[in-house]
Design a protein with these regions (language model features):
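An edge-strand/N-cap motif at the start of beta-rich repeat modules
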Residues: 1-19
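Short loop/turn segments that connect beta-strands within beta-propeller blades
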Residues: 5-9, 51-55, 95-99, 144-148, ...
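Repeated scaffold domains used in trafficking and secretory/extracellular systems
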Residues: 23-30, 67-74, 113-123, 161-173, ...
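Beta-propeller fold detector
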Residues: 12-18, 58-62, 102-108, 151-157, ...
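Short loop/turn segments immediately following the C-termini of beta-strands
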Residues: 42, 86, 135, 183, ...
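A short loop-to-beta-strand structural motif that recurs across blades of beta-propeller domains
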Residues: 2, 46-48, 90-92, 139-141, ...
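Conserved beta-propeller blade signature
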Residues: 36-39, 81-83, 130-132, 178-180, ...
Length: 262
């Protein structure tokens, strides 16, 4: 675990529990209401727990040694972390108040290699449901944090570019909806949380890995962070207009994720 302690001119960086073996062990995490940080098991067989007050690291759960199990965890209104199934076939719920984890919902199918590479991260909607962004899956994943119900919302149509893989990466909540930022998809994903519907809109160039993540700007627009795209993109959540903005260098892997200063 990497710890960074920001200071005015100096940052202290240290590794905790450096002997833990393996690669790609955890992918994402959350600070829970109890003050502990929980890591999402990707290749790791256990959930990671960090106590930032004592700099101690511990693990719990017995989740097996399969690869790429879960990508990204979202903190629900119940204080639990919901992990999105990548190659795993079920949602993992980390019950932070008890330091235990459990699989919830039905077995999920998915297209693609190694169990599907189904969902990559997600967001908590205004309806207390977590929505998982489809990577290779043909559905949006919805987890009701209050009832524990897990269901799939089908996409209205296929996204044919690149075989329907790596469709959306990251997103934002705005105007009562969850918006998915196009990665290989040529259209924006829109989940209307009140109606429980999924739609696609806009038309962007057919290019792989266009954007990675998005932020809600002070102008009310969702700004997509350019990864391989040579431009930024602005989504208007009121009108559903999609605009290409600016000109950037054409090299790959420029940026991933961003932050909007309030």
């Amino acid at each position: 675990v990497l710890k960074v302690t920001p200071r005015v001119h100096v940052s202290k960086i240290e590794l905790l529990d450096v002997e833990a073996p393996g690669d790609f062990k955890w992918h994402g995490g959350q600070l829970a209401p109890n003050g502990f940080i929980y890591g999402v098991p990707c290749y790791a067989s256990q959930v990671l727990r960090i106590d930032p007050r004592t700099d101690t690291v511990s693990y719990f759960g017995d989740l097996g040694h399969n690869k790429a199990k879960w990508y990204g965890g979202i903190l629900g209104p119940d204080g639990n972390m919901y992990c999105m199934p990548f190659a795993a076939t079920r949602v993992l719920r980390v019950v932070t108040a008890e330091d235990r984890c459990e699989l919830i919902g039905p077995e999920l199918d998915g297209g693609g290699a190694h169990g599907g590479y189904k969902y990559h991260g997600g967001l908590l909607g205004p309806d207390n449901c977590v929505y998982g962004f489809p990577m290779n899956a043909k559905t949006v994943l919805r987890v009701n944090c209050i009832t524990g119900d897990v269901c799939e919302l089908p996409l209205p149509e296929d996204e044919p570019f690149n075989g329907g893989k790596y469709k959306w990466g990251g997103g934002c909540v705005a105007n009562g909806c969850v918006y998915g930022v196009p990665s290989d998809s040529c259209r924006v994903l829109k989940i209307d949380c009140r109606r429980g519907t999924v739609s696609l809109f806009g038309r962007l160039p057919a290019q792989k890995n266009k954007f990675q993540g998005g932020v809600l700007g002070g102008d009310g627009g969702i700004w997509c962070v350019p990864c391989d795209a040579a431009y930024a993109c602005r989504i208007d959540p009121v009108t559903d207009d999609v605009a290409i903005v600016g000109t950037l260098p054409s090299q790959h892997d420029k940026y991933q994720g961003g932050y909007a200063d309030a």
